[in-house]
């Protein structure tokens, strides 16, 4: 930098217009950089000196120059909120769509200034209304979040697309309802926003509003602007639930008063076969239950719930049979709660008394060998022959160390109460169920049995009660919770739990397909102890240390529904198994090889050894 260039920079910094003009007339470059590699015009913009900015531009200063960080100089003008400087830059061909690498568009910066005049200055020069920010989201979405109605209207009037979808698959109308601002929602609808559009979970904005107990005025606005009201009421989310189902779950009597008459039937069902009356009765919304019954009388139809097992359900196709391990002499609280949760589902619950699987002599002597195990497996195969899923619920006993050791597991417990028959019978059932490709669920003790059978490790823990569970984001469990708990942080949930033992190391590590262990951890507690696992291939295996079958009295509607949906999702897996089995199709689900599980593992290991030259 020569002396004259230093003088020009100094004159600009000191707001000395005459000196700036003199030096420019002498031929000093108006695009020189200061010692920080910033264009000299940037100092004039920051000083809000319109005259010096104008002189520099007249003498060839670059209106699209950027500083050392790649930030356009017009960004500084936006920060000063000097409309006159912004206009002079735009008039001198500053690019209204300038977006340097890894930077946001200039229009987004204008929107974030919250100044309508500045936004209009860029719009009048052809700024791209539907551009994306550096994260891939529409800049119009940021305008909606700002809740500046004047700016939103200006963008819409210039042609911003009210039906843009963000990279998460949600139309902008979903962002608008989050603001709870009726005027913004109305503005989008008036400019053509589709009130019937769905997000990636299959929910319309009406569904989402109901799940969040949304503002009735906003809901009414959306409905009144629907082209086909009957159609929008009968749209279903991915769980098969309609607007009426969600209203019944939320207990929103105002919605029922206003819109129930739009439904030609009150017996519309979701994927699990539930009607709105099922949910209103289950959750204690008596007023809504009465409204549904009154509406059914007006329609001269009988209103049904799945709980009552009426002829309405008897006429539906065959339903899956779910085997539940139990002891007919000792029915524990958690075991009964599991059976009751399943009975609310679209399935038949069939008890299997595990004591009938183990030979009496073996149980009396607490003796185990291959002959006894094979006899238990033969009995288990008989009991599970026509079943479509297996559930091993919680109980008051621990996994027997001798049984676990025989199957390759490890149990480090000393003074616990062991149940030899239960441990052997349930591991025999597990072997049969896994070979058949049958869906499996284990709760509390069942969680430990499954992991011990799959060569996991069980340890003792001081009597532990917990509520807070951390869910792994890439798990099926997270997916289920996400669909049904939109108002909560899905990765932090409250569940009831009480146990003396824990899974120290998960099982399934010796069973590999495509280099994946059979099981993965899907939830932990605040002590980082394993709270849930699920299978990564083959038929679904889901285990829970906590108790989704036990609802606390403090649970919200959303938490009650969440627990029901965990069971509903499992029953849907059983239904898939039932259909594949009845069609003679491969029942290994994700594993397209019609071989036993053991054969598949051995084949995989043989392939790996061949590749290594062993």
Curated annotation (Swiss-Prot):
Coiled-coil portions: none
Keyword Repeat found: yes
Catalytic-site annotation from UniProt: 444, 547, 549
Keyword Repeat appears in the UniProt entry: yes
Start-end of each ANK repeat: 3-32, 36-65, 69-98, 102-131, 135-164, 168-197, 201-231, 239-268, 272-301
Source organism, top-level taxon: Bacteria
Keywords: ANK repeat, Glutamine amidotransferase, Repeat
Recorded GO MF terms: hydrolase activity
Domain Glutamine amidotransferase type-1 positions: 348-580
Disulfide partners: none
Alphabetical list of Pfam families matching this protein: Ank, Ank_2, Peptidase_C26
InterPro entries for the chain: Ankyrin_rpt (IPR002110), Ankyrin_rpt-contain_sf (IPR036770), Class_I_gatase-like (IPR029062), Peptidase_C26 (IPR011697)
Name used for this protein in its record: Putative ankyrin repeat protein RBE_0997
Lineage: Bacteria, Pseudomonadati, Pseudomonadota, Alphaproteobacteria, Rickettsiales
């Amino acid at each position: 930098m020569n002396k004259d260039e230093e003088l020009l920079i100094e004159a600009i910094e000191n707001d000395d217009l005459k000196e700036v003009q003199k030096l420019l007339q002498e031929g000093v470059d108006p695009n020189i950089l200061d010692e920080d590699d910033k264009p000299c015009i940037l100092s004039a913009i920051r000083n809000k000196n319109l005259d010096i900015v104008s002189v520099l531009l007249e003498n060839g200063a670059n209106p699209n120059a950027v500083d050392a960080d790649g930030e356009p100089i017009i960004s500084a003008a936006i920060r000063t909120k000097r409309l006159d400087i912004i206009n002079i830059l735009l008039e001198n061909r500053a690019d209204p769509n300038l977006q340097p690498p890894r930077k946001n568009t200039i229009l987004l910066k204008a929107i974030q200034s919250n100044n309508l005049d500045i936004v209009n200055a860029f719009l009048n020069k052809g700024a791209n209304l539907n551009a994306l920010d550096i994260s891939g989201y529409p800049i119009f979405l940021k305008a909606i979040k700002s809740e500046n109605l004047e700016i939103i209207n200006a963008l819409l009037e210039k042609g911003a697309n009210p039906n843009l979808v963000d990279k998460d698959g949600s139309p902008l109308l979903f962002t608008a309802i989050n603001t709870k601002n009726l005027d913004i929602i109305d503005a989008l609808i008036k400019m053509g926003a589709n009130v019937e559009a769905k997000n990636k979970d299959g929910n319309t904005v009406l569904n989402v509003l109901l799940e969040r107990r949304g503002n009735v005025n906003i809901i009414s606005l959306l409905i009144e602007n629907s082209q086909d009201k009957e159609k929008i009421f009968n749209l279903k989310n991915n769980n098969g639930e309609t607007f009426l189902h969600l209203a019944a779950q939320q207990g929103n009597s105002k919605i029922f008063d206003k819109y129930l008459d739009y439904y030609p039937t009150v017996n519309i069902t979701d994927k699990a076969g539930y009607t709105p009356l099922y949910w209103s009765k289950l959750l204690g919304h008596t007023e809504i239950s009465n409204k549904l019954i009154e509406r059914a009388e007006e329609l001269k139809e009988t209103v049904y719930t799945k709980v009552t097992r009426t002829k309405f359900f008897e006429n539906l196709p065959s339903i899956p049979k779910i085997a539940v391990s139990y002891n007919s002499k000792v029915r524990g609280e958690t075991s009964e709660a599991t059976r009751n949760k399943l009975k609310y589902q679209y399935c038949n619950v069939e008890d299997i008394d595990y004591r009938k699987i183990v030979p009496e002599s073996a149980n009396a002597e607490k003796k185990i060998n291959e002959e006894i195990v094979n006899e238990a497996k033969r009995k288990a195969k008989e009991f599970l022959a026509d079943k479509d899923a297996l559930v091993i619920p919680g109980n008051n006993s621990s996994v027997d160390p001798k049984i676990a050791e025989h199957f390759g597991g490890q149990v480090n417990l000393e003074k616990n109460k062991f149940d030899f028959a239960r441990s052997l019978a349930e591991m025999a059932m597990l072997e049969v169920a896994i070979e058949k490709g049958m869906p499996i669920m284990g709760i509390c003790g069942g969680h430990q049995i499954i992991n011990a059978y799959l060569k996991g490790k069980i340890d003792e823990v001081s009597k532990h009660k917990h509520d807070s569970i951390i869910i792994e984001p890439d798990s099926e469990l997270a997916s289920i919770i996400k669909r049904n708990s939109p108002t909560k942080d899905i990765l932090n949930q409250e569940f009831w739990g009480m146990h003396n033992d824990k899974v120290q190391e998960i099982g399934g590590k010796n069973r590999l397909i495509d280099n994946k262990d059979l099981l993965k951890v899907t939830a932990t507690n605040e002590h980082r102890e394993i709270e849930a696992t699920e299978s990564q291939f083959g038929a679904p295996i889901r285990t829970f240390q906590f108790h989704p079958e036990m609802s606390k009295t403090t649970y919200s509607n959303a938490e009650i529904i969440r627990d029901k949906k965990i069971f509903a999702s499992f029953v849907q897996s059983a239904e898939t198994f039932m259909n594949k089995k009845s069609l003679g199709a491969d029942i290994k689900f994700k594993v397209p090889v019609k071989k036993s599980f053991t054969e598949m593992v051995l084949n995989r290991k043989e392939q790996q050894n061949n590749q290594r030259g062993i």
